[in-house]
Amino acid sequence: MESIEYKFAETLKSSELSLKQRQVLISSLKLFSEIGFENTTSNLIAEHAGVSEGTVFSYFKTKEGILDAILSRFLEQVIPEVIADFSDKRFAIGQETFSLFLRSIVQDRLVFIHNNKMQVKILLSRSLIDKSISEELGNIIVHSIINPITPVLNQFKKKWCYSRLVK
């Protein structure tokens, strides 16, 4: 299972951003994840990225601007790719039983969240502050998880033994 940080770096490779901009964004994500947004200074970002502090601000103006650039890339590319990888792997019709299907999904997502807890924390905490991020995240979840899982759930409903409900 690839990390969000790795996926983020991969999406930046195919972007129109300069090498220095990519270095600033990758370093910022790493630092925001490790020590928090509030504790990360522009000087730390510059040092970690191997650029001058002036370079950081010439590209992104503020730390908020850096975070916005990271989150927009997350919402446009990283999260949809991560969910698509998960959906392709977990939502295949023909699962053994509903309980095994459900258990595998929950276990997979718990491992994913554990492995990416700081990046998930950044995204979720920002979605509490910014309603547009929250709405976009909701749309991504509906289109990338709810819609693909519906046919699988319908298959389980067809096989469900209704007498188990009546007991």
Residue ranges of each PLM-predicted region?
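N-terminal intrinsically disordered/low-complexity leader segments
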Residues: 1-19, 86-89
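Helix-turn-helix
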Residues: 12, 23, 31-65, 69-70
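Short coil/turn segments at alpha/beta junctions that flank glycine-rich nucleotide-binding fingerprints
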Residues: 34-38, 116, 159
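Short helix-capping/turn signature of helix-turn-helix
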Residues: 37, 60, 124-130
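Hydrophobic alpha-helical connector segments
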Residues: 69, 84-115
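Amphipathic alpha-helical packing segments from all-alpha helical-bundle domains
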Residues: 100, 110-124, 131-158
